[in-house]
């Protein structure tokens, strides 16, 4: 009886283990974005935030926390507001925006740009983002531009007063250098166009001579009709010579041989005709078979992502926490698709792209063998290995796919395909913050 009781206990043991694992995973799924499940108290606890000038190292959130999680100071020329934000690069006021530095940046604050540099102006109808603060050269400014009126008048007055001198103002030097660069660029364009046209002409001439010296098809195929025409003549002559040959052999054996040979000919012709009919019927049957349609209908960005999510939910046996997180990310993605439809990745802010590039780098997570990097993302876009080898980070990949005509929703779809939902979530949050759209409220988690 004791042995029977032990067997019953062993049969219930796997069920208890599975139930305990499911309850633990359900508890992890109830934790928020910046919360982890405390095994001691059994409750969700807030991840330790970082101070200003620091960024989080490793990952913490959604019920899990790495053992090496902590905060590290920002490197030089970068800043962070603290909390759970990563360090971002300071604004390059003079190099990128062509503006003066109003307040230099430090580890806790970003740099603030002032007015435009001399000889530059700001567009009136500029976009309401970081690119709207870029200053442009007065050489390309429309007439009567307020910022460029004093510069152009000063240059004209100075040139009229010192017409006989050899000294030039810095603005005139810049104008002279720009004009020289413009002439050089024009000469390069003309030279490249000439070389391209000459190469096309050489290729066309070579193809013309090849087609001219190539023998024509009817000349090659003229011999079989000649042979077929000679064949009936030979058979006709043999038919004419047949009676004479019969007379020359009076023996019965030889006569029987001659008379027996024509009887075999109809039989062989019937066999050949039957074989030809069989081959013809086979060819007709094979021609009537419909060819498979290899061209699939193009799928929309959102529909393909929803189909991918359904397929993942059916085939994979993942925990309820990961499924709820995937649903949250898909809801945010659906909202982002309507905001950035038709926009290329390079139209996003520089800090947003740099953050995504860092998340896709090989040094972002310690699990290098599991987490996919920007190289896997490049392979999903169909780039060749030699082209991927010439890139150093995700920023160059974003420039490449933007040049190829890919949009932001297509980039998000590829990130989901390589199982980088953390990058999708971070990029969607930055896009909504940049566009000023409130993210959709996530539904409460289902009770296990």
Swiss-Prot record:
Per its record, what triggers expression of this gene product?
A: By activin A in 12 dpc dental epithelium.
Pfam families noted in UniProt: Death_EDAR
Disulphide bridges: 31-44, 47-60, 50-71, 74-87, 93-113, 135-148
Q: Which SUPFAM superfamilies match?
A: DEATH domain (SSF47986)
Bias kind Polar residues: ranges:
258-283
Which GO terms label this protein's molecular function in UniProt?
A: signaling receptor activity; transmembrane signaling receptor activity
- Which terms are listed as keywords in the entry? Apoptosis, Developmental protein, Differentiation, Disease variant, Disulfide bond, Glycoprotein, Membrane, Receptor, Repeat, Signal, Transmembrane, Transmembrane helix
Give the protein's biological function: Receptor for EDA isoform TAA, but not for EDA isoform TA-2. May mediate the activation of NF-kappa-B and JNK. May promote caspase-independent cell death.
What name does UniProt use for this protein? Tumor necrosis factor receptor superfamily member EDAR
Whose protein is this, by species?
A: Mus musculus (Mouse)
The uppermost taxa in this organism's lineage are: Eukaryota, Metazoa, Chordata, Craniata, Vertebrata
Gene name tied to this protein: Edar
